[in-house]
Each structure stands twice: as C-alpha cells, then as structure tokens.
C-alpha cells in the first residue's frame, strides 16, 4: 500500500489487479536484503505496467529508499536499494548518491543459514543510532573532526571523550569507513585481488 501511495507522485496509478507468484531460494530475515529486492521488483513491475515513466536504476533505487527508510522508517542506509537496482558491484557515494559500477569477476560466495530468528531491524536501529550519537558527540568536542576525512582522526583522543558503552560503535564507524576506502581502492585497480577483498569483507563483518 505504501509503494502504491508513493508511486502516485510518479503518475503511476494501478487500475486493475494481477495474480502474482513470487518464488526464491534466498532465505528471508537473514540480512540478505530480500525485503529490498521484493520492493524493487514490485516498483519495477508497477512502473512498467501502469505508467509511461522512464524506468532507470537510479529511479528504482530512489523510490525504494523512500519507501523503506523514509516512509516505513527502517534503519538501513541506501546500499541495499542501489546495489540491487544497479546490479553487479558498485561503489555508492552516499553524500551525492553517485554510483561507480565495477565489472570485475568475483568468486562464488557460500552463505550459511542458521535458521535462527533474529531482529535484523532492531539490530540495525541500535547500531545506527549509537554510531550517530557517538559521532555527534565527538564533532561537538572536536569541530575539525570529519568522518569522511581520515586525516582528521585522533582515535584515542576521541574515544577518551565517550562513555565506554559508545566507544565500540564509534570505533566501528571509523573502522568501517577505512575498510570502505580500502575496498574502493582495490576495485579501482584493473586486476581485482580476491584475497584482499575477502579479508576486507571479513574485517567489515
């Protein structure tokens, strides 16, 4: 219902129904972006069926982000929506929503499913909230700090100003950004070193 309401802004108004069957071997509620994939597929179908709007990867990403994060209030960022909409491997500059696509051959990945229920949304909300709180506190104390500029990092000094419970979240935010920059550097090379990428993925996880 939310998707249909949002799509009215794009002059997409369904006037008849369809019987749709969706099947997949991707486990749900496992942090594999299955909800984003479904929303993007749904938006793509509706736009192509009930509107004359030109459908692009950028448009699908923007609308799905609006639905999932702004309208529904989920705590994720933009990476799921943009990666699924564009396909393959991308680097997303979240400040400008600029996408850099890559066409490297990646190795196969093995996904282990524990079948244990988990609160993915609750976990994301906790991580995001505490990371933003810690970053904001450091910025207030050290105005020159810029998380997008590693040269401004004085980690030990920053950590000393935070409560112990917030330190892991700030350390993770800093560490994850460095990992992202290192991964971008590797993907910008003509030859992709799978071992280095695998190591960075493990560090990030």
Which residues are covered by each model-predicted region?
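Gly/Ser-rich oxyanion-binding loop with an adjacent helix/lid
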Residues: 1-104
